[in-house]
Amino acid sequence: MLPPRRLDLPWSELAANADALEASSSPRFLQRIEASLDQPTHDPYGQPIPTPDGHIESRRDARLRELARPRWAPVRITRVADAPLETLVFLDERHPRPDTRSRIQACTAENDIIKVRSAEWHGTLLPAGAGVLHASLHDEAAR
């Protein structure tokens, strides 16, 4: 996976440039970029990149709000779904990136507002943020 910090770019800028580059580049050029990055298997948002033969890795994850019960559930952020630019900027500033280990501290009855703690950040995610983060249960998540 290519983390946004490897290029020292925020998600919002990375997304805009990646879309433009992909749309305007030849397959050969894109293959060379992938090779120079050691053939990443996931994009910066944690989404699987198809193999040359078209295979896409399946994931066992769920939206964060679907994992919000029980309280204190340890989770590992696996990916960020497509989201509006404002949501990506909000998340980028708070660091809940793929492979981040976190704990769900509290949530509303509808699981749409979730309080999360990780080593890098703790705070509240409103529906826009909680709805685009995907995670899996993890027994070694941050306290």
What is each residue range found by the language model?
Residues 1-11:
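Conserved segment of winged-helix/HTH DNA-binding domains
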Residues 128-143:
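Short, charged, intrinsically disordered terminal tails
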Residues 16, 22-132:
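Mid-protein regulatory/catalytic core that forms ligand/cofactor-binding pockets
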